[in-house]
Amino acid sequence: MVEDTASVAALYRSYLMPLGIDINIVGTGRDAIDSLKHRIPDLILLDLRLPDMTGMDVLHAVKASHPDVPIIFMTAHGSIDTAVEAMRHGSQDFLIKPCEADRLRVTVNNAIRKASKLKNDADSAGSQNYQGFIGSSQKMQQVYRTIDSAASSKASIFITGESGTGKEVCAEAIHAASRRGDKPFIAINCAAIPKDLIESELFGHVKGAFTGAATDRQGAAELADGGTLFLDELCEMDLDLQTKLLRFIQTGTFQKVGSSKMKSVDVRFVCATNRDPWKEVQEGRFREDLYYRLYVIPLHLPPLRERGEDVIEIAYSLLGYMSHEEGKNFVRFSQPVIDRFNEYEWPGNVRQLQNVLRNVVVLNNGKEITMEMLPPPLNQPFERKESVQPDLSELISVRDICPLWLTEKLAIEQAIKACDGNIPRAAGYLDVSPSTIYRKLQAWNEKEEKQKA
Protein backbone atom coordinates (compact mmCIF):
# COMPACT_ATOMS: atom_id res chain seq x y z
CA MET A 1 0.00 0.00 0.00
CA VAL A 2 1.46 3.34 -1.07
CA GLU A 3 -0.17 5.98 1.17
CA ASP A 4 1.56 9.00 2.69
CA THR A 5 -1.06 9.71 5.38
CA ALA A 6 -0.33 7.34 8.26
CA SER A 7 -3.83 7.47 9.76
CA VAL A 8 -5.46 6.62 6.43
CA ALA A 9 -2.98 3.78 5.84
CA ALA A 10 -3.71 2.36 9.30
CA LEU A 11 -7.47 2.58 8.68
CA TYR A 12 -7.25 0.78 5.35
CA ARG A 13 -4.99 -1.86 6.87
CA SER A 14 -7.68 -2.55 9.50
CA TYR A 15 -10.29 -2.83 6.73
CA LEU A 16 -8.20 -5.47 4.95
CA MET A 17 -7.20 -7.53 7.99
CA PRO A 18 -10.15 -9.98 7.62
CA LEU A 19 -8.74 -11.07 4.24
CA GLY A 20 -5.69 -12.54 6.00
CA ILE A 21 -3.19 -10.92 3.65
CA ASP A 22 0.26 -9.51 4.42
CA ILE A 23 0.23 -5.72 3.99
CA ASN A 24 3.39 -3.63 3.56
CA ILE A 25 2.88 0.15 3.82
CA VAL A 26 5.22 2.76 2.32
CA GLY A 27 4.75 6.51 2.27
CA THR A 28 6.54 7.65 -0.89
CA GLY A 29 6.76 6.68 -4.52
CA ARG A 30 10.51 6.09 -4.29
CA ASP A 31 10.06 3.69 -1.36
CA ALA A 32 7.42 1.82 -3.36
CA ILE A 33 9.71 1.41 -6.38
CA ASP A 34 12.71 0.43 -4.23
CA SER A 35 10.67 -2.18 -2.34
CA LEU A 36 10.22 -4.13 -5.58
CA LYS A 37 13.93 -4.97 -5.50
CA HIS A 38 13.34 -7.11 -2.41
CA ARG A 39 9.83 -8.50 -2.88
CA ILE A 40 7.25 -8.60 -5.67
CA PRO A 41 3.75 -8.00 -4.25
CA ASP A 42 0.56 -9.67 -5.46
CA LEU A 43 -1.11 -6.24 -5.63
CA ILE A 44 -0.26 -2.55 -5.20
CA LEU A 45 -2.75 -0.08 -3.71
CA LEU A 46 -1.45 3.27 -4.97
CA ASP A 47 -2.42 6.76 -3.85
CA LEU A 48 -2.55 9.15 -6.80
CA ARG A 49 -0.93 12.04 -4.92
CA LEU A 50 2.36 11.40 -3.15
CA PRO A 51 4.90 13.79 -1.58
CA ASP A 52 7.81 13.01 -3.93
CA MET A 53 6.16 12.08 -7.24
CA THR A 54 2.76 11.37 -8.77
CA GLY A 55 1.03 8.04 -8.70
CA MET A 56 1.31 8.02 -12.51
CA ASP A 57 5.10 8.18 -12.19
CA VAL A 58 5.04 5.15 -9.90
CA LEU A 59 2.68 3.33 -12.27
CA HIS A 60 5.02 3.81 -15.24
CA ALA A 61 8.06 2.71 -13.19
CA VAL A 62 6.35 -0.43 -11.89
CA LYS A 63 4.93 -1.44 -15.26
CA ALA A 64 8.33 -0.96 -16.90
CA SER A 65 10.02 -3.47 -14.59
CA HIS A 66 7.12 -5.68 -13.46
CA PRO A 67 4.29 -5.46 -16.00
CA ASP A 68 2.30 -8.30 -14.42
CA VAL A 69 1.89 -6.68 -10.98
CA PRO A 70 -1.71 -5.41 -10.70
CA ILE A 71 -2.22 -1.84 -9.45
CA ILE A 72 -5.35 -0.26 -7.97
CA PHE A 73 -5.41 3.53 -7.69
CA MET A 74 -6.93 5.33 -4.71
CA THR A 75 -8.11 8.78 -5.66
CA ALA A 76 -10.25 11.67 -4.43
CA HIS A 77 -13.35 12.75 -6.38
CA GLY A 78 -11.52 15.59 -8.11
CA SER A 79 -8.98 13.36 -9.80
CA ILE A 80 -11.19 10.65 -11.29
CA ASP A 81 -10.22 11.68 -14.83
CA THR A 82 -6.59 11.05 -13.95
CA ALA A 83 -7.49 7.65 -12.49
CA VAL A 84 -9.34 6.71 -15.68
CA GLU A 85 -6.26 7.76 -17.64
CA ALA A 86 -4.17 5.55 -15.36
CA MET A 87 -6.36 2.57 -16.23
CA ARG A 88 -5.51 3.14 -19.89
CA HIS A 89 -1.84 2.79 -18.93
CA GLY A 90 -2.21 -0.47 -17.04
CA SER A 91 -3.97 0.20 -13.73
CA GLN A 92 -6.49 -2.55 -12.98
CA ASP A 93 -9.06 -0.44 -11.11
CA PHE A 94 -9.51 2.68 -9.00
CA LEU A 95 -11.22 3.45 -5.70
CA ILE A 96 -12.66 6.79 -4.68
CA LYS A 97 -11.45 8.10 -1.30
CA PRO A 98 -12.69 7.94 1.37
CA CYS A 99 -13.25 4.26 0.66
CA GLU A 100 -15.78 2.13 2.53
CA ALA A 101 -14.45 -1.02 4.18
CA ASP A 102 -16.61 -3.47 2.25
CA ARG A 103 -15.87 -1.85 -1.11
CA LEU A 104 -12.13 -1.94 -0.40
CA ARG A 105 -12.23 -5.58 0.72
CA VAL A 106 -14.19 -6.80 -2.31
CA THR A 107 -12.01 -4.89 -4.80
CA VAL A 108 -8.75 -6.09 -3.25
CA ASN A 109 -10.01 -9.65 -2.78
CA ASN A 110 -11.12 -9.96 -6.42
CA ALA A 111 -7.90 -8.38 -7.74
CA ILE A 112 -5.68 -10.75 -5.74
CA ARG A 113 -7.70 -13.80 -6.78
CA LYS A 114 -7.54 -12.78 -10.44
CA ALA A 115 -3.79 -12.14 -10.23
CA SER A 116 -3.25 -15.45 -8.42
CA LYS A 117 -5.16 -17.35 -11.11
CA LEU A 118 -3.10 -15.72 -13.88
CA LYS A 119 0.11 -16.58 -12.01
CA ASN A 120 -0.97 -20.17 -11.51
CA ASP A 121 -1.87 -20.48 -15.20
CA ALA A 122 1.55 -19.16 -16.18
CA ASP A 123 3.44 -21.33 -13.71
CA SER A 124 1.52 -24.41 -14.82
CA ALA A 125 2.09 -23.88 -18.54
CA GLY A 126 2.73 -27.22 -20.14
CA SER A 127 1.27 -29.14 -17.20
CA GLN A 128 -2.07 -30.91 -17.15
CA ASN A 129 -3.86 -28.09 -15.31
CA TYR A 130 -7.46 -27.05 -15.05
CA GLN A 131 -8.75 -23.88 -13.37
CA GLY A 132 -6.06 -23.90 -10.68
CA PHE A 133 -5.86 -27.70 -10.39
CA ILE A 134 -2.84 -29.68 -11.55
CA GLY A 135 -3.09 -33.32 -12.53
CA SER A 136 -4.47 -35.61 -15.20
CA SER A 137 -5.39 -38.77 -13.27
CA GLN A 138 -8.70 -40.44 -14.09
CA LYS A 139 -10.26 -39.36 -10.81
CA MET A 140 -9.36 -35.71 -11.42
CA GLN A 141 -10.62 -35.91 -15.01
CA GLN A 142 -13.98 -36.89 -13.51
CA VAL A 143 -13.81 -33.85 -11.22
CA TYR A 144 -13.10 -31.59 -14.21
CA ARG A 145 -16.03 -33.06 -16.16
CA THR A 146 -18.38 -32.46 -13.24
CA ILE A 147 -17.24 -28.85 -12.92
CA ASP A 148 -17.69 -28.27 -16.66
CA SER A 149 -21.19 -29.75 -16.56
CA ALA A 150 -22.38 -28.03 -13.39
CA ALA A 151 -20.69 -24.62 -13.56
CA SER A 152 -23.27 -22.96 -15.82
CA SER A 153 -26.18 -24.11 -13.65
CA LYS A 154 -27.47 -22.25 -10.61
CA ALA A 155 -27.87 -25.56 -8.76
CA SER A 156 -26.05 -25.82 -5.44
CA ILE A 157 -22.83 -27.85 -5.39
CA PHE A 158 -21.65 -29.76 -2.31
CA ILE A 159 -17.91 -30.50 -2.32
CA THR A 160 -16.60 -33.26 -0.06
CA GLY A 161 -13.04 -34.38 0.54
CA GLU A 162 -10.33 -34.68 3.14
CA SER A 163 -8.58 -31.59 4.50
CA GLY A 164 -5.99 -30.30 2.07
CA THR A 165 -7.51 -31.76 -1.10
CA GLY A 166 -8.30 -28.33 -2.58
CA LYS A 167 -11.99 -27.73 -1.83
CA GLU A 168 -11.69 -23.93 -2.03
CA VAL A 169 -9.70 -24.22 -5.27
CA CYS A 170 -12.57 -26.35 -6.57
CA ALA A 171 -15.14 -23.76 -5.51
CA GLU A 172 -13.15 -21.02 -7.25
CA ALA A 173 -12.94 -23.18 -10.39
CA ILE A 174 -16.72 -23.60 -10.38
CA HIS A 175 -17.16 -19.84 -10.01
CA ALA A 176 -14.61 -19.02 -12.73
CA ALA A 177 -16.26 -21.42 -15.20
CA SER A 178 -19.76 -20.10 -14.50
CA ARG A 179 -21.67 -17.17 -15.98
CA ARG A 180 -20.96 -15.39 -12.68
CA GLY A 181 -17.20 -15.54 -13.19
CA ASP A 182 -16.86 -11.75 -13.39
CA LYS A 183 -18.92 -11.24 -10.21
CA PRO A 184 -17.76 -11.56 -6.59
CA PHE A 185 -16.60 -14.87 -5.13
CA ILE A 186 -17.01 -14.63 -1.35
CA ALA A 187 -15.78 -17.41 0.93
CA ILE A 188 -16.71 -17.86 4.57
CA ASN A 189 -15.16 -20.56 6.77
CA CYS A 190 -17.83 -21.74 9.17
CA ALA A 191 -15.26 -23.49 11.39
CA ALA A 192 -12.92 -20.51 11.76
CA ILE A 193 -15.44 -17.92 12.98
CA PRO A 194 -16.69 -17.89 16.60
CA LYS A 195 -20.28 -19.02 17.08
CA ASP A 196 -21.43 -15.60 18.31
CA LEU A 197 -19.98 -13.80 15.26
CA ILE A 198 -20.77 -16.08 12.35
CA GLU A 199 -24.32 -14.76 11.83
CA SER A 200 -22.92 -11.24 11.52
CA GLU A 201 -20.21 -12.47 9.13
CA LEU A 202 -22.81 -14.20 6.99
CA PHE A 203 -25.66 -11.67 7.01
CA GLY A 204 -24.04 -8.45 8.27
CA HIS A 205 -25.26 -6.18 11.04
CA VAL A 206 -26.58 -2.67 11.64
CA LYS A 207 -25.05 -0.05 13.90
CA GLY A 208 -25.77 -0.80 17.56
CA ALA A 209 -26.85 -4.40 16.95
CA PHE A 210 -24.41 -5.56 19.64
CA THR A 211 -21.49 -4.27 21.67
CA GLY A 212 -18.81 -3.13 19.28
CA ALA A 213 -21.11 -2.69 16.27
CA ALA A 214 -20.13 0.94 15.68
CA THR A 215 -21.24 1.04 12.03
CA ASP A 216 -23.43 -0.84 9.59
CA ARG A 217 -21.61 -3.77 8.01
CA GLN A 218 -22.31 -5.89 4.96
CA GLY A 219 -22.12 -9.65 5.38
CA ALA A 220 -20.86 -12.30 3.00
CA ALA A 221 -24.35 -12.86 1.56
CA GLU A 222 -24.69 -9.23 0.49
CA LEU A 223 -21.11 -8.97 -0.76
CA ALA A 224 -21.68 -12.04 -2.96
CA ASP A 225 -24.78 -10.60 -4.66
CA GLY A 226 -24.69 -11.63 -8.31
CA GLY A 227 -21.81 -14.02 -7.70
CA THR A 228 -20.96 -17.11 -5.67
CA LEU A 229 -21.15 -17.65 -1.91
CA PHE A 230 -18.79 -20.40 -0.75
CA LEU A 231 -19.60 -21.90 2.65
CA ASP A 232 -16.54 -23.87 3.71
CA GLU A 233 -16.74 -26.47 6.51
CA LEU A 234 -20.52 -26.07 6.49
CA CYS A 235 -21.13 -29.02 8.81
CA GLU A 236 -19.50 -27.00 11.62
CA MET A 237 -22.33 -24.43 11.52
CA ASP A 238 -24.56 -24.14 14.59
CA LEU A 239 -28.03 -25.68 14.19
CA ASP A 240 -29.80 -22.39 14.98
CA LEU A 241 -27.94 -20.61 12.20
CA GLN A 242 -28.62 -23.55 9.86
CA THR A 243 -32.32 -22.68 10.20
CA LYS A 244 -31.69 -19.09 9.10
CA LEU A 245 -29.45 -20.27 6.27
CA LEU A 246 -32.21 -22.61 5.06
CA ARG A 247 -34.69 -19.71 4.98
CA PHE A 248 -32.15 -17.61 3.06
CA ILE A 249 -31.64 -20.39 0.48
CA GLN A 250 -35.39 -20.90 0.07
CA THR A 251 -36.35 -17.23 -0.29
CA GLY A 252 -33.18 -15.42 -1.36
CA THR A 253 -33.82 -12.94 1.46
CA PHE A 254 -32.26 -12.34 4.87
CA GLN A 255 -32.13 -9.86 7.74
CA LYS A 256 -29.00 -8.21 9.04
CA VAL A 257 -28.35 -8.74 12.73
CA GLY A 258 -30.27 -6.03 14.59
CA SER A 259 -32.47 -5.11 11.62
CA SER A 260 -36.13 -5.86 10.83
CA LYS A 261 -35.75 -5.11 7.12
CA MET A 262 -35.46 -7.92 4.61
CA LYS A 263 -32.76 -7.78 1.95
CA SER A 264 -32.89 -9.72 -1.30
CA VAL A 265 -29.82 -11.01 -3.15
CA ASP A 266 -29.02 -13.39 -6.00
CA VAL A 267 -26.21 -15.81 -5.11
CA ARG A 268 -25.09 -19.26 -6.21
CA PHE A 269 -24.31 -21.59 -3.29
CA VAL A 270 -21.24 -23.78 -3.20
CA CYS A 271 -20.41 -25.51 0.08
CA ALA A 272 -17.80 -27.93 1.34
CA THR A 273 -16.99 -30.22 4.24
CA ASN A 274 -14.33 -32.75 5.21
CA ARG A 275 -16.99 -34.86 6.93
CA ASP A 276 -19.66 -37.21 5.62
CA PRO A 277 -22.68 -34.86 5.41
CA TRP A 278 -25.28 -37.65 5.47
CA LYS A 279 -23.68 -39.12 8.59
CA GLU A 280 -23.89 -35.65 10.16
CA VAL A 281 -27.62 -35.62 9.33
CA GLN A 282 -28.13 -39.06 10.88
CA GLU A 283 -26.34 -38.01 14.06
CA GLY A 284 -28.42 -34.83 14.39
CA ARG A 285 -25.67 -32.30 13.74
CA PHE A 286 -26.89 -31.18 10.32
CA ARG A 287 -30.46 -30.39 9.27
CA GLU A 288 -31.90 -32.92 6.83
CA ASP A 289 -33.92 -30.29 4.93
CA LEU A 290 -30.79 -28.13 4.55
CA TYR A 291 -28.91 -31.20 3.31
CA TYR A 292 -31.44 -31.77 0.52
CA ARG A 293 -31.38 -28.08 -0.41
CA LEU A 294 -27.60 -27.99 -0.80
CA TYR A 295 -26.64 -31.55 -1.76
CA VAL A 296 -27.97 -31.13 -5.31
CA ILE A 297 -24.73 -31.77 -7.21
CA PRO A 298 -22.22 -33.74 -5.10
CA LEU A 299 -18.56 -33.41 -6.04
CA HIS A 300 -15.95 -35.52 -4.25
CA LEU A 301 -12.26 -34.58 -4.35
CA PRO A 302 -10.00 -37.64 -4.14
CA PRO A 303 -7.15 -37.68 -1.60
CA LEU A 304 -3.67 -37.22 -3.03
CA ARG A 305 -2.74 -40.86 -2.34
CA GLU A 306 -5.41 -41.94 -4.87
CA ARG A 307 -4.29 -39.59 -7.65
CA GLY A 308 -1.46 -41.72 -9.04
CA GLU A 309 1.32 -39.85 -10.80
CA ASP A 310 -0.38 -36.48 -10.16
CA VAL A 311 1.81 -36.38 -7.03
CA ILE A 312 5.01 -35.82 -9.02
CA GLU A 313 3.31 -33.50 -11.50
CA ILE A 314 2.10 -31.30 -8.65
CA ALA A 315 5.48 -31.49 -6.93
CA TYR A 316 7.35 -30.27 -10.02
CA SER A 317 4.88 -27.42 -10.56
CA LEU A 318 5.24 -26.31 -6.93
CA LEU A 319 9.02 -26.67 -7.05
CA GLY A 320 9.28 -24.35 -10.05
CA TYR A 321 7.05 -21.72 -8.49
CA MET A 322 8.63 -21.84 -5.02
CA SER A 323 12.20 -21.85 -6.33
CA HIS A 324 11.46 -18.71 -8.33
CA GLU A 325 9.68 -17.06 -5.41
CA GLU A 326 12.47 -17.83 -2.93
CA GLY A 327 15.30 -17.02 -5.37
CA LYS A 328 16.60 -20.61 -5.41
CA ASN A 329 17.89 -22.83 -8.24
CA PHE A 330 16.07 -26.12 -7.64
CA VAL A 331 14.98 -27.80 -10.87
CA ARG A 332 14.56 -31.51 -10.12
CA PHE A 333 14.04 -34.29 -7.58
CA SER A 334 16.40 -37.23 -7.07
CA GLN A 335 14.97 -40.64 -7.96
CA PRO A 336 14.80 -41.75 -4.28
CA VAL A 337 12.74 -38.61 -3.52
CA ILE A 338 10.39 -39.35 -6.41
CA ASP A 339 10.00 -42.92 -5.15
CA ARG A 340 9.34 -41.71 -1.60
CA PHE A 341 6.74 -39.17 -2.78
CA ASN A 342 4.96 -41.94 -4.68
CA GLU A 343 5.09 -44.37 -1.74
CA TYR A 344 3.98 -41.90 0.92
CA GLU A 345 0.30 -41.79 1.93
CA TRP A 346 0.10 -37.94 2.22
CA PRO A 347 -2.45 -37.73 5.06
CA GLY A 348 -2.44 -33.93 4.71
CA ASN A 349 -2.89 -34.16 0.93
CA VAL A 350 -1.83 -31.33 -1.40
CA ARG A 351 -1.51 -28.88 1.50
CA GLN A 352 1.03 -31.19 3.16
CA LEU A 353 2.98 -31.52 -0.10
CA GLN A 354 3.06 -27.72 -0.37
CA ASN A 355 4.37 -27.38 3.18
CA VAL A 356 7.03 -30.06 2.66
CA LEU A 357 8.35 -28.38 -0.49
CA ARG A 358 8.28 -24.92 1.08
CA ASN A 359 10.35 -26.26 3.98
CA VAL A 360 12.86 -27.89 1.64
CA VAL A 361 13.22 -24.91 -0.71
CA VAL A 362 13.63 -22.35 2.09
CA LEU A 363 16.14 -24.33 4.17
CA ASN A 364 18.33 -25.79 1.41
CA ASN A 365 20.26 -24.84 -1.72
CA GLY A 366 21.23 -26.59 -4.92
CA LYS A 367 19.59 -27.83 -8.09
CA GLU A 368 18.34 -31.23 -6.92
CA ILE A 369 16.07 -32.12 -4.00
CA THR A 370 17.62 -35.11 -2.20
CA MET A 371 16.38 -37.41 0.57
CA GLU A 372 18.59 -35.68 3.16
CA MET A 373 16.68 -32.43 2.61
CA LEU A 374 13.23 -33.87 3.34
CA PRO A 375 11.65 -33.17 6.74
CA PRO A 376 10.20 -35.94 8.95
CA PRO A 377 8.47 -38.28 8.38
CA LEU A 378 9.48 -38.41 4.72
CA ASN A 379 13.20 -38.71 5.51
CA GLN A 380 12.61 -41.71 7.77
CA PRO A 381 12.57 -45.40 6.73
CA PHE A 382 9.35 -46.27 4.96
CA GLU A 383 7.31 -48.90 6.79
CA ARG A 384 5.59 -51.12 4.30
CA LYS A 385 2.28 -52.66 5.22
CA GLU A 386 2.59 -56.38 5.78
CA SER A 387 1.45 -58.20 2.69
CA VAL A 388 -1.24 -60.84 2.89
CA GLN A 389 0.33 -64.25 2.43
CA PRO A 390 -1.56 -66.57 0.07
CA ASP A 391 -2.97 -69.77 1.58
CA LEU A 392 -0.91 -72.64 0.13
CA SER A 393 -2.21 -75.30 2.50
CA GLU A 394 -4.87 -76.61 0.14
CA LEU A 395 -3.72 -79.10 -2.48
CA ILE A 396 -4.55 -78.26 -6.08
CA SER A 397 -4.55 -80.38 -9.21
CA VAL A 398 -2.07 -79.89 -12.03
CA ARG A 399 -4.88 -78.33 -14.06
CA ASP A 400 -4.97 -75.42 -11.57
CA ILE A 401 -1.29 -74.58 -11.89
CA CYS A 402 -0.83 -71.18 -13.52
CA PRO A 403 2.30 -70.35 -15.55
CA LEU A 404 4.76 -68.30 -13.51
CA TRP A 405 4.82 -65.43 -16.02
CA LEU A 406 1.02 -65.18 -15.90
CA THR A 407 0.97 -65.26 -12.09
CA GLU A 408 3.51 -62.44 -12.10
CA LYS A 409 1.53 -60.49 -14.69
CA LEU A 410 -1.71 -60.77 -12.70
CA ALA A 411 0.03 -59.74 -9.47
CA ILE A 412 1.54 -56.65 -11.11
CA GLU A 413 -1.74 -55.66 -12.81
CA GLN A 414 -3.64 -56.02 -9.53
CA ALA A 415 -1.06 -53.93 -7.67
CA ILE A 416 -1.18 -51.16 -10.30
CA LYS A 417 -4.98 -51.13 -10.16
CA ALA A 418 -4.97 -51.01 -6.34
CA CYS A 419 -2.56 -48.05 -6.49
CA ASP A 420 -4.77 -46.17 -8.99
CA GLY A 421 -2.26 -46.52 -11.81
CA ASN A 422 0.68 -45.29 -9.74
CA ILE A 423 3.43 -47.66 -10.94
CA PRO A 424 6.20 -46.43 -8.58
CA ARG A 425 3.86 -46.88 -5.61
CA ALA A 426 2.80 -50.33 -6.83
CA ALA A 427 6.47 -51.24 -7.16
CA GLY A 428 7.00 -50.25 -3.54
CA TYR A 429 4.33 -52.68 -2.34
CA LEU A 430 5.63 -55.44 -4.64
CA ASP A 431 9.16 -54.83 -3.32
CA VAL A 432 10.65 -54.35 -6.79
CA SER A 433 11.99 -51.30 -8.59
CA PRO A 434 9.64 -49.27 -10.83
CA SER A 435 11.96 -49.93 -13.78
CA THR A 436 11.32 -53.67 -13.37
CA ILE A 437 7.58 -53.15 -13.76
CA TYR A 438 8.00 -50.78 -16.71
CA ARG A 439 10.28 -53.31 -18.41
CA LYS A 440 7.86 -56.21 -17.89
CA LEU A 441 4.87 -54.17 -19.07
CA GLN A 442 6.76 -53.26 -22.22
CA ALA A 443 7.68 -56.91 -22.82
CA TRP A 444 4.09 -58.08 -22.37
CA ASN A 445 2.81 -55.36 -24.71
CA GLU A 446 5.35 -56.36 -27.36
CA LYS A 447 4.33 -60.01 -26.96
CA GLU A 448 0.66 -59.14 -27.45
CA GLU A 449 1.46 -57.04 -30.53
CA LYS A 450 3.37 -59.95 -32.09
CA GLN A 451 0.48 -62.32 -31.39
CA LYS A 452 -1.94 -59.91 -33.09
CA ALA A 453 0.36 -59.64 -36.11
From Swiss-Prot:
ATP binds at residues 161-168, 224-233. PROSITE patterns: RESPONSE_REGULATORY, SIGMA54_INTERACT_2, SIGMA54_INTERACT_3, SIGMA54_INTERACT_4. The modification 4-aspartylphosphate is found at residue 47. Keywords: ATP-binding, DNA-binding, Nucleotide-binding, Phosphoprotein, Repressor, Transcription, Transcription regulation, Two-component regulatory system. Residues 1-112 form the Response regulatory domain. It comes from the Bacteria. Residues 133-362 form the Sigma-54 factor interaction domain. InterPro entries: AAA+_ATPase (IPR003593), CheY-like_superfamily (IPR011006), Homeodomain-like_sf (IPR009057), HTH_Fis (IPR002197), P-loop_NTPase (IPR027417), QS_regulatory_LuxO (IPR053402), Sig_transdc_resp-reg_receiver (IPR001789), Sigma_54_int (IPR002078). The keyword DNA-binding applies. One of its GO terms (molecular function) is ATP binding. Involved in the regulation of different processes depending on the cell density. Acts together with sigma-54 to repress, perhaps indirectly, some genes. This is Regulatory protein LuxO. It comes from Vibrio vulnificus (strain YJ016). The gene is luxO.
